[in-house]
Amino acid sequence: MREHKNFWDRNAGLYDCFMRKDRAVYEKIYELIRPIVKDKTVLELATGTGLIAKHIVKVTARIEATDASPEMIAEAKRGNCSAKLHFSVQDMFSLPYAGNSFDVVIVSNALHIVPQPEKSLREIKRVLKDDGVLIAPTFTHAENSLRGRIKAYFMRLAGFPLHSRWTSEEYLSFLRLRRGEHQNAIKTVPQRQGAGHRLLGCQRGKSA
């Protein structure tokens, strides 16, 4: 995890520039997320520079936006103008929040780059309310085009911490197996480099 965090610390200042090429993808994600988080208490894990949190905070009750990288959080705080949005450095495997604290948990483009995604899901389940919603879009690198595979190769050479190369169905199966719940609001958002980008709202049942 230290190497993982160091990669993002080194690249925090470049992150927003890097993400601009996927602006259309993210605009679609904001559009899909806003109705789900309206008037809700939200936790975002792996917020990076806070792109998603800043674009949806207006409709929420409040957002706790967290990341393991201090440099990413420093970048996020620079552009924060909302009293409803709080940024902090946290470990997604060991969160300081009480159980059943949040209506919605967002973990975007992160489960494929952490070494133990199942451990993160256990912690998410702990802090999510019984009728809460998990929103977990991620890149499905097994479906990359040739261009996407070449790009991913050079990103790995630069230290990008890719751990899981799921297909869309493998990712869905991973979530179902670990969470044992039904999914609602499942959408697939095409991604420019040829990787699937899947938005999942997972309703957690009372018996889960």
Model regions: which residues?
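A short glycine-rich, Lys/Arg-flanked "PGG" loop and its adjoining helix->strand segment in the class I
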Residues: E118-D130
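Class I SAM-dependent methyltransferase SAM/SAH-binding core
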Residues: L43, T47-S94
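Short catalytic micro-motifs in class I SAM-dependent methyltransferases
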Residues: N109-A110
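Conserved alpha-helix/loop element of class I SAM-dependent methyltransferases that forms part
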Residues: K21-K40
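A conserved beta-strand element that flanks and buttresses the S-adenosyl-L-methionine
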Residues: I106
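Conserved class I S-adenosyl-L-methionine
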Residues: V133-L162
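N-terminal, positively charged/glycine-rich alpha-helical extensions of SAM-dependent methyltransferases
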Residues: M1-G13
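Short alpha-helix
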Residues: P161-R179
